[in-house]
Amino acid sequence: MATVTLNVKTVRPLGERVLVKVSQSEEKTAGGILLPDTVKEKPQIGEIIAEGPGRRNDDGSFQPLEVTVNSKVLYSKYAGTDIKLENEEYVLLSEKDILAIIA
């Protein structure tokens, strides 16, 4: 059986999905207390690393996504599938789970 090495460059989302690199959560509180992983909030902000071709129209063409690679986005808290690639945290989301583009 062949093995496949997954890295960011080999993951290509399908349809209207995007791969988002999750921003790091805060390590300390404002008072300087270190936070263990079990109490850290899951970040909801990240940068789009890869995108699918978009939604397929009735005529077979694709409607492009509203977001683009390198856009910083805010997404729903419980949306998507968490993925760990090359020791970095990513989330695979549908475009509909993206709430806003951050300028």
UniProtKB/Swiss-Prot annotation:
Coiled coil: none annotated. It is found in: Plastid, Cyanelle. The keyword NADP does not apply. Its main location: plastid. GO terms for cellular component: cyanelle. Disulfide bonds: none annotated. GO terms for biological process: chaperone cofactor-dependent protein refolding. Keywords: Chaperone, Cyanelle, Plastid. InterPro entries: Chaperonin_GroES, Chaperonin_GroES_sf, Chaprnonin_Cpn10_CS, GroES-like_sf. It comes from the Eukaryota. Belongs to the GroES chaperonin family. Heptamer of 7 subunits arranged in a ring. Interacts with the chaperonin GroEL. This is Co-chaperonin GroES. It comes from Cyanophora paradoxa. The gene is groES1.
